[in-house]
Amino acid sequence: MPQQYPLPVFHFTVQWGGTRIGFSEVSGLTQENQAIEYRDGSFPEYSSIKMPGLRKFSNVTLKRGVVAADNEFFNWLSTIRLNKVERRDVVIALLNEEHAPVMVWKIHNAFPVKVEGPQLKASGNEVAIESIELAHEGLELQND
């Protein structure tokens, strides 16, 4: 039987529209269920009951190094108009040492809500990093 071990976070891929794009960081792969509190006046207990409510998904943030002449983030953000938005499905895969996906997050109907350029500093010695924040309508996890 193969030994089970925790997966490292540094080996992953991100794809949208069939294109694989390199990112240095992904965050916000969060899903939660809201709790609904309810109490009927005839309940013998003096407390409310709780039931599951609507699912809620946090925005996903993707960060990568700035590449000259690559304006993909800003171009996608600029396509948003009133009642018109270009939505994309995004696939994030955590890979094993053979570069095969072992966990896959599928983000449905994503669109950009924020694009942030790099922080510029005259005394800095880092790579320029840009980020895009995506709102979406669902998060699906596949764990092979």
Residues covered by each model-derived region:
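Glycine-rich, low-complexity intrinsically disordered segments
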Residues: M1-D144
